[in-house]
């Protein structure tokens, strides 16, 4: 029977592979020959009628005769792409600034930004024209938003102060009659620009300095007009002795050159031929050969300093000539000459009607600058403004766009209301729209120049749909606003996310992503393409879309290549479908300036691919596609991206990338999983192995689609087999070593590829380990022969490691020939669990290991113990053999590994005793563990025990002996005392202990002590003072309040002195009860951390004894007492005499004296 091992590939995050999983070797590039579209953006679109996908390319049109949209498809040759213009696109008259191209299952929307002049007016505007196409690219609706207010609900009020509109208004026919809206056909009838001819008086009556001021005035006027009037052209005619054209309308189109010519004009002087100069303009300026257009509005500005002089023509004749019809004339008179009625009447004759609006008079040339704003207001007056505030004139409707349901579109109006911006919710069915901008809560000063509507996106939430709009210049940092379409009194965008860096253009690109493809938006990507560190590298913020009104939460950020600056990463973004076939949406992000400046003609720009997974988007890209790897001559590659549809019909999602001059389509490569199996014959390695082991290695393709089958036929599989990879000395090896290393096999078709090879034993087969499995690792990769191929080559999954592990077991002397079941019992005990550093010398652990089951192979014991335990000795049995290595540091512990009964531990017991010395140094932790771990090569036979140790540190601290102090209260009622406490000892391990000094300050109800000062000798000693009702360990009689001093000490010695003032003058009654005052000293510490070795010396006392003397009695008392005493003495003597006391005694004494004399005489006689 064969033993078959199957393995699944391990999930892992690897470094990006260059070709996962878009095929850069085969790309469709739009042709660069004349007439091909110069790309602004590109889009993949599918026609639902035939399910065919085409490439739509938007180009910058120079005029109305060139198409703005092209449809491209694969031509007859499979590697070429052919493009045809798409009809029906609205192309108004004007200068085209850009094209917005979006699409979905409802159709395709093309919006062109147009720079033109308003109908029958000098006012210029920057607006949009949009065409909505059906899914098969037929025209569905179109609108030219030249007069945006005409498209709005007439009941919708827009407040130009706070830039928000209120909801309400009329419906039905009332709406249709609101304002007249112009069609593109009507646009053809409008005039072609504005032509302004300046007629400058250069006669001799003008001083050169004044003439220079006139030239400066003309230069300033032209600059201001160029900024306000998009299609204004100028001509300048000077008159005097001669009449000459300084520059005409055609030459003024070069703005810088024409401004330079103004300053280089030389004054011609002499006569004042004003009428002839005006006729010269009619004959030589407002003609086609000089750049004049037939339908252009024509303006003549005459600047003069007085009467006409020396002119052969009559002014009235010139004014009434047919050529003057339709020319708007402004007359500016400079100087005092116009105080004369005739001269002023002549000036008014030059001007058009009404004379008051077209005639200007100043006293001198220095005052001309004051006319600029008034003249500009008359010539290029911006209708619909409040002051200088613009409303819809520069709205650029359609700058961004989204197609909604029910014939509605959402259009960005980035330039509305002084570029505060907004959006137009427009219905193509009834031609009406609602203007949406920021909430009234926003400060009107901060919303100006926000560019709201620069980008738009639609978020699909569980409770409905909401719209988000980017405002990249909001408060200079950028912001994202959201509009929730619900039944509310007001529809307005509310700020939801703010940018973090000034100038980063945060919010300029928005990309909603439905990761799991369930129809609900999961993430919103917000780009800041100008985010700068060293240059404008760019950054993309990934926000999780909240439910209902919750806040957007930042998941993470994405960035391009860290070593490249000015890449503008995030300039374009798109969700491109499931290009790696894992059922999660992927995202493409463009960095169009990456690699810019590498060399003349070199391609630059990149696109990064970020794959989705169940939790969102991966932080790192799976592929970076550089322009140089796709085709030569690609510039700004990555300025637009789109995808998610199958372009070439292979069933896989493809993407399109726009560059400056062409669009590129890249096809996806099929992603395949390989299931690797390995079969051994025999299925286990015998104990005594002689011969060969037959091995069959098979790779099976596990792919959900058939797209990989054609490409597999041209693939090669390169695999390597490594035998016994976990051992330094191999026990088996391939018989043919070349057959196991970098084997290249062609995949000839089908889903299987199998290979046979032989394993043979080495000389070291059973020298040490004949029991543990032999591990065999197989690594593999696909290779191609290179070149372009009709079918995309498959690729392995980027997120799965291309390797497999197999185990070849040895036969075992057990019931199961492959696995032995050992039963390991482990018991331990330790000599003591509480260790005192500085006191404890040794600690011993006894270890008992018993195997009561089958054989245990390669049994190992690992001892993990703290570093302050130094290994001393080990006591081990003779049999089975125990061999231990020297301890080695691993992280914060020491590890000692021991081999127990190698190679086989039979049914037996092992008793081991390990002794450590406790290091006399500070141990930082309160506790530590000694862990014993038993392991072997068997399956499921792990044993472990842990013993916890508790550590304390020893110290010696001795307080000075008790002492006595005296206070003579009879001499002085108060005294100054200093109480000295000396601490000395040995503190090797930095133990922290507290010295508490207790000074009684209130006895009974009398305040007798006041502490004046506290001193110490060590800087690191910290002392605190407080008044407490109790102090010390034992109570003291009569004391009601204490002054407590607590000092935290870590040194070997310390002297603490407390100075106090003792006052007992007013407490005579207290002194009768109290004869002494105790001052206490006591050492305390945390007994769970430290061990004090001499507790008997941790207390002391200083006793203050009060000395008292008897008081001297007064003189009357002494005299009275003396007299009384004498009288008592006299009475006593009289009583004794009366009783014969003195008489009897005298007689007895005489008798005794006579007797002694008689005896003495007798004694002498005898001698």
Swiss-Prot record:
Binding-site residues for Ca(2+) 2, renumbered to this chain: 578, 580, 582, 586
Signal sequence residues: 1-19
Locations listed in the record: Membrane
Membrane topology, record value: Single-pass type I membrane protein
Start and end residues of each stretch annotated as X-domain (extra domain): 149-192
GO molecular function list: metal ion binding
Chain residues that bind Ca(2+) 1: 514, 516, 518, 522
Keyword entries, A-Z: Calcium, Cell adhesion, Cleavage on pair of basic residues, Disulfide bond, Glycoprotein, Integrin, Magnesium, Membrane, Metal-binding, Receptor, Repeat, Signal, Transmembrane, Transmembrane helix
Residue intervals passing through the bilayer: 1115-1137
Amino-acid positions noted as binding Ca(2+) 3 in the UniProt annotation, renumbered to this chain: 646, 648, 650, 654
Ubl conjugation is among the record's keywords: no
Sequence ranges on the Extracellular membrane side: 20-1114
Source organism, top-level taxon: Eukaryota
Domain VWFA: start-end pairs: 193-382
Disulphides: 72-83, 130-164, 698-754, 814-820, 884-898, 998-1023, 1031-1047
Annotated stretches, region: Disordered: 163-191
Positions glycosylated per UniProt: 51, 256, 314, 341, 364, 418, 437, 718, 773, 829, 846, 911, 925, 968, 1013, 1055, 1086
Motif (GFFKR motif): 1140-1144
GO biological process: cell adhesion; integrin-mediated signaling pathway
Family membership: Belongs to the integrin alpha chain family.
Functional summary from the UniProt entry: Integrin alpha-E/beta-7 is a receptor for E-cadherin. It mediates adhesion of intra-epithelial T-lymphocytes to epithelial cell monolayers. Mice expressing a null mutation of the alpha-E subunit gene exhibit a marked reduction in the numbers of intraepithelial lymphocytes in the gut and in the development of gut-associated lymphoid aggregates, supporting a specific role for this integrin in mediating retention of lymphocytes in the intestinal wall.
Notes concerning its domains: The integrin I-domain (insert) is a VWFA domain. Integrins with I-domains do not undergo protease cleavage.
Protein name according to UniProt: Integrin alpha-E
């Amino acid at each position: 029977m064969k033993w078959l091992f199957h393995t699944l590939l391990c999930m892992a995050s690897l470094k990006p592979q260059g070709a996962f999983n878009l095929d850069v070797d085969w790309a469709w590039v739009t042709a660069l020959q004349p007439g091909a579209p110069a790309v602004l953006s590109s889009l993949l679109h599918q026609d639902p009628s035939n399910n065919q996908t085409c490439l739509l390319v938007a180009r910058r049109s120079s005029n109305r005769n060139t198409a703005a949209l092209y449809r491209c498809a694969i031509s007859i040759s499979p590697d070429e792409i052919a493009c045809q213009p798409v009809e029906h696109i609205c192309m108004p008259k004007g200068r085209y600034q850009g094209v917005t191209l979006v699409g979905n299952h409802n159709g395709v929307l093309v919006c062109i930004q147009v720079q033109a002049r308003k109908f029958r007016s000098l006012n210029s505007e920057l607006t949009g024209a949009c065409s909505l196409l059906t899914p098969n690219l037929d025209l569905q609706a179109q609108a030219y938003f030249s007069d945006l207010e005409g498209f709005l609900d007439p009941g919708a009020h827009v407040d130009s102060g706070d830039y928000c509109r209120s909801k309400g208004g009329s419906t039905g026919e009332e709406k249709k009659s609101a304002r007249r809206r112009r069609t593109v056909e009507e646009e053809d009838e409008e005039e072609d620009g504005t032509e302004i001819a300046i007629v400058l008086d250069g006669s001799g009556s003008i001083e050169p300095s004044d003439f220079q001021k006139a030239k400066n005035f003309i230069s300033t006027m032209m600059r201001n007009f160029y900024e306000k009037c998009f299609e204004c052209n100028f001509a300048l005619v000077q008159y005097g002795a001669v009449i000459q054209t300084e520059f005409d309308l055609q030459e003024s189109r070069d703005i810088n050159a024409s401004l330079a010519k103004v300053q280089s004009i030389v004054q011609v002087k002499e006569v004042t031929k004003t009428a002839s100069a005006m006729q010269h303009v009619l004959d030589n300026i407002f003609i086609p050969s000089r750049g004049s257009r037939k339908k252009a509005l024509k303006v003549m500005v005459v600047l003069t300093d007085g009467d006409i002089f020396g002119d052969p023509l009559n002014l009235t004749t010139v004014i009434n000539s047919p050529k003057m019809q339709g020319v708007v004339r402004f007359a500016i008179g400079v100087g005092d000459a116009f105080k004369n009625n005739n001269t002023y009447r002549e000036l008014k004759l030059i001007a058009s009607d009404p004379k008051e609006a077209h005639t200007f008079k100043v006293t001198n040339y220095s005052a001309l600058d004051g006319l600029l704003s008034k003249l500009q207001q008359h010539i290029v007056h911006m209708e619909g403004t409040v002051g200088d505030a613009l409303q819809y004139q520069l709205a650029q409707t359609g700058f961004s766009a989204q197609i909604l349901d029910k014939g509605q579109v959402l259009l960005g109006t980035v330039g509305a209301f002084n570029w505060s911006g907004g959006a137009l919710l427009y219905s193509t069915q009834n031609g009406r729209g609602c203007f949406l901008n920021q909430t009234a809560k926003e400060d009107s000063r901060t919303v100006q120049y926000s560019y709201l509507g620069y980008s738009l996106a639609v978020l699909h939430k569980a409770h409905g749909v909401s719209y988000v709009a980017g405002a990249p210049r909001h408060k200079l940092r950028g912001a994202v606003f959201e509009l929730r379409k619900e039944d509310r009194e007001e529809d307005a965008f509310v700020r939801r996310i703010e940018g973090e860096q000034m100038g980063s253009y945060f919010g300029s690109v928005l990309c909603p992503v439905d990761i799991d493809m369930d129809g609900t938006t999961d993430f919103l990507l917000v780009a800041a393409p100008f985010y700068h560190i060293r240059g404008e590298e760019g950054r993309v913020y990934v926000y999780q879309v909240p439910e209902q009104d919750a806040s957007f939460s930042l998941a993470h950020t994405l960035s391009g290549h860290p070593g490249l600056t000015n890449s503008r990463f995030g300039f374009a973004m798109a969700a491109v479908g499931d290009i790696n076939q894992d059922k999660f949406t992927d995202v493409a992000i463009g960095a169009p300036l990456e690699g810019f400046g590498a060399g003349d003609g070199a391609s630059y720009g990149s696109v990064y691919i970020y794959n989705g997974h169940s939790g969102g988007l991966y932080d790192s890209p799976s592929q970076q596609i550089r322009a140089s790897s796709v085709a030569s001559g690609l510039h700004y590659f990555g300025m637009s991206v789109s995808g998610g549809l199958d372009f070439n019909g292979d069933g896989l999602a493809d993407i399109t990338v726009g560059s400056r001059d062409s669009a590129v389509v890249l096809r996806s490569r099929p992603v395949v999983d390989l299931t690797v199996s390995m079969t051994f014959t025999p299925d286990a390695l015998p104990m005594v192995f002689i011969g060969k082991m037959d091995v069959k290695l098979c790779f099976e393709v596990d792919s959900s689609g058939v797209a990989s089958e054609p490409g597999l036929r041209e693939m090669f599989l390169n695999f390597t087999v490594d035998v016994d990879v976990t051992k330094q000395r191999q026990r088996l090896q391939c018989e043919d070593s070349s057959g196991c290393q970098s084997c290249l096999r062609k995949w000839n078709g089908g889903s299987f590829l199998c290979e046979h090879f032989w394993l043979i034993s080495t000389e070291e087969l059973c020298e040490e380990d004949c029991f543990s499995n032999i591990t065999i690792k197989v690594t593999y990769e696909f290779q191609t022969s290179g070149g372009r191929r009709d079918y995309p080559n498959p690729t392995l999954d980027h997120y799965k490691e291309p390797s497999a592990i197999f185990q070849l077991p040895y036969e075992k002397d057990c019931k199961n020939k492959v696995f032995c079941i050992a039963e390991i019992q482990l018991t331990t005990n330790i000599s003591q669990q509480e260790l005192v550093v500085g006191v404890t010398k040794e600690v011993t652990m006894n270890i008992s290991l018993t195997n009561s089951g089958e054989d245990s192979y390669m049994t190992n014991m690992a001892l993990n113990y703290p570093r302050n335990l130094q290994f001393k000795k080990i006591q081990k049995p003779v049999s089975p053999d125990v061999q231990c290595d020297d301890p080695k540091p691993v992280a914060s512990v020491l590890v000692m590994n021991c081999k127990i009964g190698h190679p086989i531990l039979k049914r037996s017991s092992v008793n081991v005793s390990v002794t450590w010395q406790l290091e006399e140094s500070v141990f930082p932790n309160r506790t530590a563990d000694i862990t014993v771990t038993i392991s072997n090569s068997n399956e499921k036979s792990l044993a472990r025990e842990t013993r916890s140790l508790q550590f304390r540190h020893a110290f010696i601290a001795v307080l000075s002996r008790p002492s006595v102090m005296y206070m003579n209260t009879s001499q002085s009622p108060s005294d100054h005392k200093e109480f000295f406490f000396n601490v000395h000892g040995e503190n090797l391990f930095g133990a922290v202990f507290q010295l508490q000094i207790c000074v009684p300050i209130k006895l009974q109800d009398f305040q007798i002590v006041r502490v004046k000062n506290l001193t110490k000798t060590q800087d690191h000693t910290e002392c605190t003072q407080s008044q407490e009702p109790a102090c010390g360990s034992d109570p003291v009689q009569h004391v009601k309040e204490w002054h407590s001093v607590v000092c935290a000490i870590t040194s070997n010695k310390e002297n603490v002195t407390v100075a106090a003032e003792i006052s007992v003058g007013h407490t005579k009654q207290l002194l009768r009860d109290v004869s002494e005052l105790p001052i206490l000293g006591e050492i305390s510490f945390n007994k769970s951390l430290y061990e004090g070795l001499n507790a008997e010396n941790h207390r002391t006392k200083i006793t203050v004894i009060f000395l008292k003397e008897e008081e001297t009695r007064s003189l009357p008392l002494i005299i009275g007492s003396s007299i009384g005493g004498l009288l008592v003495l006299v009475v006593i003597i009289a009583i004794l005499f009366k009783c014969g006391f003195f008489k009897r005694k005298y007689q007895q004494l005489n008798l005794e004296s006579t007797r002694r004399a008689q005896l003495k005489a007798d004694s002498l006689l005898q001698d």
